From Swiss-Prot:
GO MF term set: ATP binding; histidine-tRNA ligase activity
Gene3D superfamilies: Anticodon-binding domain, Bira Bifunctional Protein, Domain 2
Complex and partners: Homodimer.
Catalytic activity: tRNA(His) + L-histidine + ATP = L-histidyl-tRNA(His) + AMP + diphosphate + H(+)
UniProt entry keywords in alphabetical sequence: Aminoacyl-tRNA synthetase, ATP-binding, Cytoplasm, Ligase, Nucleotide-binding, Protein biosynthesis
Cell location: Cytoplasm
EC numbers, comma separated: 6.1.1.21
Primary location class: cytoplasm
Family statement: Belongs to the class-II aminoacyl-tRNA synthetase family.
Organism field: Neisseria meningitidis serogroup C (strain 053442)
Name of this protein: Histidine--tRNA ligase
Database matches in InterPro entries: aa-tRNA-synth_II, aa-tRNA-synth_II/BPL/LPL, Anticodon-bd, Anticodon-bd_dom_sf, His-tRNA-ligase, HisRS-like_core, HisRS/HisZ, HisRS_anticodon
Top-level taxonomy: Bacteria, Pseudomonadati, Pseudomonadota, Betaproteobacteria, Neisseriales
Broadest EC class assigned to this enzyme: ligase
Gene encoding the protein: hisS
Length: 431
């Protein structure tokens, strides 16, 4: 027997049934996707789909060459034909904005776009952190005021309500100011951290030289006292940045959205400025961040487009659905409405016709294939979770009748005219 080929470590199959180490099913996932589609439409967002492979330069330019994502985590390879460096996308914003610039989508109006799909990072796999993971992203492009900042946070809070997990999530916010303000803060931060360089761990020493703001994001408990006393970026904000942040907070207050100001919240990608935020939970262990985002007013220009102030966020689907599966609510209906079975050598064709007629009327029908006893077929109908069973027997063909059974018992088992099949099932379903 040939050796089995396993899936790549950290990349999961999505199956109709739960797995030992990955409890999410395809039906649960599909129910979430349906919810997201309805949710985004209510806010006027249109879907965009981009390739999972992009030129590596896109991420170097947008995310930042010195970030952990670009430096250590991307799957990068050369195209065999022209040695062009390509990468599997590690996040969705850069790809979305590349498409916007390439196709000139902002030529006459702002855009509200959303995406959903797989991302890839070479990380140590653990629950809630995978090498192939999935995100839903929201991008509001060409909007300058703090009102859109507040709106997209209200939008995310609305989704948490729909999923029944709002009480388990905490909103953290901060302002990173503009480029000049960050540069002034960076100089002060480097001077401060250099005094404690001998106490920093190796990762923080590397970040001190490449992206000192990320030192403040360390999870090392031995460095918390040093980081808490570090210069705060909020103290370097100019009047315009302060006003934007103050108006943003006032809008959250007016919407009744509670938040915590976290001056150490910096996000892991270099393109952010002004407003940044994260939704976190204490229900998922170390993987506390479920959703995060912020402003990236200079990114479209950095990618070759005309300047356009923008803001967005992304949520990790796996983490979010783990939270929903344990604490929230999501209506999942993977079972068929009807399980159609047959007895007799000519009944199989007729049951196929009945099944097709029911599908045209909106019923989900699973049709039995093969020839088994009625008892065996009924067992499969029960295992399928179908609400109703349709039985077509050989002796019913001549008199134009069928047998219907309500698997929940409410209507029992009845023989009805084939012409009344659809109406009867509709009445039972709506009762």
């Amino acid at each position: 027997m040939a050796q089995k080929i396993q899936s790549v470590k950290g990349m999961n199959d999505l199956l109709p049934v739960e797995q030992k180490d990955f409890k999410l099913t395809a039906a649960f996932w599909q129910a979430f996707e349906d919810t997201v589609g309805r949710w985004t439409r209510t806010y006027g967002y249109q879907q965009i789909r981009t390739p999972i492979v992009e030129q590596t330069g896109l991420f170097v330019r947008s995310i930042g060459e010195e970030t952990d994502v670009v430096g250590k985590e991307m799957y990068t390879f050369s195209d065999s034909n022209d040695s062009l460096s390509l990468s599997l996308r590690p996040e969705g914003t850069a790809s979305c904005l590349r498409a916007v610039v390439e196709h000139n989508l902002l030529y006459n109006s702002p855009q509200k776009l959303w995406y959903m799909g797989p991302m890839f990072r070479r990380e140590r796999p653990q629950k809630g952190r995978y090498r192939q993971f999935h995100q839903v992203g929201i991008e509001a492009l060409g909007f300058e005021g703090p009102d859109i900042d507040a709106e997209i946070i209200a939008m995310s809070a609305d989704l948490w309500e729909k999923l029944g997990i709002r009480e388990y999530l905490t909103l953290e916010i901060n302002s990173l100011g503009n480029r000049e303000e960050r540069a002034a803060h960076r100089a002060a931060l480097v001077e401060y951290l250099t005094r404690y360089e001998d106490k920093l761990d190796e990762d923080s020493k590397r970040r001190l030289k490449t992206n000192p703001l990320r030192v403040l994001d360390t999870k090392n408990p031995d460095l918390q006292e040093i980081c808490n006393a570090a210069p705060r970026l909020v103290d370097y904000l100019g009047e315009a940045s302060q006003n934007h942040y103050a108006r943003f907070k006032a809008m959250l207050d007016g919407l009744g959205i509670q938040y915590i100001e976290n001056p150490r919240l910096v996000r892991g990608l270099d393109y952010y400025n002004q407003t940044v935020f994260e939704w976190t939970t204490d229900k998922l262990g170390a993987q506390a961040t479920v959703c995060g985002g912020g402003r990236y007013d200079g990114l479209i220009e950095e990618l070759g487009g005309k300047p356009a102030p923008s803001i967005g966020f992304a949520m990790g689907i796996e983490r979010l659905l783990f939270l929903v599966s344990e604490y929230g609510s999501l209506e999942v209906n993977a079972a068929p409405d009807v399980y159609a079975m047959h007895q007799g050598e000519r009944a199989d064709l007729q049951v196929m016709k009945y099944a097709q007629a029911l599908r045209t009327q909106g019923f989900n029908v699973m049709q039995h294939s093969g020839y088994q006893s009625l008892k065996a077929q009924m067992k499969k109908a029960d295992n399928s979770g179908a609400r109703f069973a349709l039985i077509v027997a050989q002796d019913e063909l001549a008199n134009g009748t069928v047998t219907l059974k309500d698997m929940n018992g409410a209507h029992g088992q009845q023989t009805v005219a084939a012409a009344d099949l659809t109406n009867t099932l509709q009445q039972w379903k709506n009762a």
